[in-house]
C-alpha cells in the first residue's frame, strides 16, 4: 500500500523549508522514515516477505546517505531532524 497522498502532503507541509519545497533533505528523509515505519509494521505480520525486506534495506541505506549528507552540510539541521523524527544517530 504505502503512504497515502494525504499523509504525504502532511509530511511535506510539516518538514518543508520554504513554500514550494518538496526535495530538501529534511522532506526526503521524513518521507523515507514514514515508508520505513510502514514496512516495519508490514513485516510484523508478513515475516516471509523477503522481496519487500530487500526494498526496506535499500531504503534504510538511502536514508542513511541523506542523513550523512545533511550532517556534513549543516549539523544543526541534522540534530533537529534526528530529534523530531526520533531516529538513532
UniProtKB/Swiss-Prot annotation:
Disulfide bonds: none annotated. GO terms for cellular component: cytosolic small ribosomal subunit. It holds the Pfam family Ribosomal_S15. GO terms for molecular function: rRNA binding; structural constituent of ribosome. SUPFAM superfamilies: S15/NS1 RNA-binding domain (SSF47060). Keywords: Ribonucleoprotein, Ribosomal protein, RNA-binding, rRNA-binding. Coiled coil: none annotated. The keyword Magnesium does not apply. InterPro entries: Ribosomal_uS15 (IPR000589), Ribosomal_uS15_bac-type (IPR005290), uS15_NS1_RNA-bd_sf (IPR009068). One of its GO terms (biological process) is translation. The keyword Transferase does not apply. PANTHER family: RIBOSOMAL PROTEIN S15, BACTERIAL AND ORGANELLAR, SMALL RIBOSOMAL SUBUNIT PROTEIN US15M. Belongs to the universal ribosomal protein uS15 family. Part of the 30S ribosomal subunit. Forms a bridge to the 50S subunit in the 70S ribosome, contacting the 23S rRNA. One of the primary rRNA binding proteins, it binds directly to 16S rRNA where it helps nucleate assembly of the platform of the 30S subunit by binding and bridging several RNA helices of the 16S rRNA. Forms an intersubunit bridge (bridge B4) with the 23S rRNA of the 50S subunit in the ribosome. HAMAP family: Ribosomal_uS15_B. This is Small ribosomal subunit protein uS15.
